[in-house]
Amino acid sequence: MRSSVIVAVLVVVALAALLTQGQELKYQEREMVAELAQQIYRVAQAPWAAAVGPHKRNSELINSILGLPKVMNDAGRR
């Protein structure tokens, strides 16, 4: 997980270096770099939070699994 964060940081640094060669960053580019930096920071602080996603109770998981055949059957009729 740490290696992927390091790779992501290197990619952002490389993109920033390419974009700033001989020119200033435009507003959209600055916004994009800031957004990427925020996402990398969030992953570095709590890597499990990004991977887990929203928490579901066991009953919600069971109900969604039990409802799959009905959803697939309804989709097949369309």
Swiss-Prot record:
Keywords: Amidation, Cleavage on pair of basic residues, Hormone, Neurotransmitter, Secreted, Signal. GO terms for biological process: chemical synaptic transmission; response to light stimulus. This is Pigment-dispersing hormone 1 peptides. Residues 1-22 form the signal peptide. GO terms for molecular function: hormone activity. The modification Alanine amide is found at residue 75. The pigment-dispersing hormone causes the migration of the distal retinal pigment into the proximal end of the pigment chromatophore cells and thus decreases the amount of light entering the retinulas. May also function as a neurotransmitter and/or neuromodulator. Eyestalk sinus gland.
